């Protein structure tokens, strides 16, 4: 997995200071690791937003003003419920060889070859990421899932993801019964059927009269 660099700065942790940082285009954040003191920092909002909406996962080298670096990963992000802006982030340090749990984005291949798509269906992605467990060197930037064998109306669950997808390098620890992707009938067909039923209703009422 590739790493990216984030320049960070220490920050005060009172509410007024946090608001001021957000007004300056920065996001209040914390960095923690089991057995170590939590560090309060701030990061550039644009850089963090780009990372959050990336289709790949990354390790992050947090660089402090004194030149020190801490390798970490993004653990959690909080959004404003009204504006959807990022208002807080949690990063987690880790040591070499430590087993991590991370959310990794999903990508899909073989859509055009899937019998369900050939029959007119659409691919509906349900899970855009999966939680995996592994040492950092084995965590992928994304998990590629082949849907080329899926039929119309079929749903793939986590437990059905082929083992060769991850080659034993990491463990998927999300709920195995969770649905990942489905091939569904086009909505247009459903709308046409509903419209036809509505047109037939007055005719039935007329006969009863």
UniProtKB/Swiss-Prot annotation:
This is Large ribosomal subunit protein bL25. The keyword Ribonucleoprotein applies. InterPro entries: Rbsml_bL25/Gln-tRNA_synth_N (IPR020056), Ribosomal_bL25/Gln-tRNA_synth (IPR011035), Ribosomal_bL25_b-dom (IPR020057), Ribosomal_bL25_C (IPR037121), Ribosomal_bL25_long (IPR001021), Ribosomal_L25_dom (IPR029751), Ribosomal_uL5_bac-type (IPR020930). Part of the 50S ribosomal subunit; part of the 5S rRNA/L5/L18/L25 subcomplex. Contacts the 5S rRNA. Binds to the 5S rRNA independently of L5 and L18. It holds the Pfam family Ribosomal_TL5_C. Gene3D superfamilies: Ribosomal protein L25, beta domain (2.170.120.20), Ribosomal Protein L25, Chain P (2.40.240.10). The keyword Nucleotidyltransferase does not apply. SUPFAM superfamilies: Ribosomal protein L25-like. This is one of the proteins that binds to the 5S RNA in the ribosome where it forms part of the central protuberance. One of its GO terms (cellular component) is cytosolic large ribosomal subunit. Keywords: Ribonucleoprotein, Ribosomal protein, RNA-binding, rRNA-binding. One of its GO terms (molecular function) is structural constituent of ribosome. GO terms for biological process: translation. Belongs to the bacterial ribosomal protein bL25 family. CTC subfamily.
